[in-house]
Amino acid sequence: MATYVIGDLQGCWSSFKQLAAQLPAADRYIFVGDLVNRGFESLATLRHVKTRVEHGKAIALIGNHDLHLLAVAAGVRRLKDGDTLQEVLDAPDREELLAWIRNRPLAHFEDGVLFVHAGVLPPWTVEQTLSLADEVHRSLAADDDNAFLRQMYGDEPSRWSDDLTGNDRLRCVVNALTRVRLLSPDGAMNLKHKGKANEAPRGDVPWFDHPQRATRDTPVVFGHWSAEGLMARSNVIGLDTGCVWGGKLTALRLQDRALFQRDCPELQTAEE
């Protein structure tokens, strides 16, 4: 069985269909999050990916844009300029789709590879990453009154401590798994920088290059960082190649790490 890992879709379902048509023997998919927003087919994307997951043909992680959709639907956040989520919010199957998103995992591990949307903090082992991701997953799935969503946003605490509890603990995990790009030498998350790694503030490094990264011997596949684009190293693979910004949509065949790409039309002009 061939498994293909797909970078950020962000509502670009037509581009995915074109990419999928060129993949030989595509039996199963892993989507690294950000299924929705900024592209103009978020509703179709959700419906099709949901069906694939329910038939055992895919695994879909949750990303920051997917969380944003949940927060907007709950009245916790407002739509931003450039958001393309209204068709999901107006859909007759809205509640079913939102409930499905709430139950998406924040991390996945198989065949010796760790999958996340954004990144992993330096002290976290694979086992701890999966355990912390499950803490957030369970809190989000059980958040019937949206209390967790109301407390989820914020940049603090920026550093991990095993002593963190409650919403501070969960917020730190969410930020790491769905938002982080850069870290300071002492492991603090810089959640403001969205540009390339070589444009980072002095001293900050990509999360995957932090010298104390406990997962350095484990391949980690992620999305999220479209400005950095495709990255293919032995222990880290970045797949967000900016489809929604007129870049490419990228697929990684897990078994042999072969890469497949499809050019995408420019749907947005600048990432915010």
Regions found by a protein language model. Name each.
Residues 1-54, 58:
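N-terminal active-site segment of His-dependent metallophosphoesterases
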Residues 5, 29-31, 60-61, 114, ...:
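Residue-level marker for buried hydrophobic side chains located in beta-strands
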